Amino acid sequence: MSVQGIDGVLQQMQVKALQASGTPIARPSVEPGFASELKAAIDKISDTQQTARTQAEKFTLGVPGVALNDVMVDLQKSSISMQMGIQVRNKLVSAYQEVMNMSV
């Protein structure tokens, strides 16, 4: 299990440990930011949809080892992840509109 907030703290602790030992520190070339996190989330939604689509296609073609319950679970996971993505987008648009409507 991975907690996203802990990764940054863990990285800082590792940097401090390297500084204390006198080892030169290699800086990461790209720091994770909002855009990279958003892209990763969209890619994950896309992968989930592709997996569900592939499973459904295999079941339709009668490939052995592909059960209907697995296909239905994958399709539901895909649907839920897409709905979550849409809700996140709606919240982002709403927050953007709120900021744009603020008086300066």
From Swiss-Prot:
GO cellular component term, pick one: bacterial-type flagellum basal body
UniProt GO molecular function: cytoskeletal motor activity; structural molecule activity
Compartments (UniProt record): Bacterial flagellum basal body
Keywords: Bacterial flagellum
Main location: other
GO BP, sorted A to Z: bacterial-type flagellum-dependent cell motility
Coiled coil regions, renumbered to chain: none
InterPro entries referenced in this protein's UniProt entry, alphabetically: FliE (IPR001624)
Pfam families per UniProt: FliE
HAMAP family per record: FliE (MF_00724)
Entry similarity comment: Belongs to the FliE family.
Protein name: Flagellar hook-basal body complex protein FliE
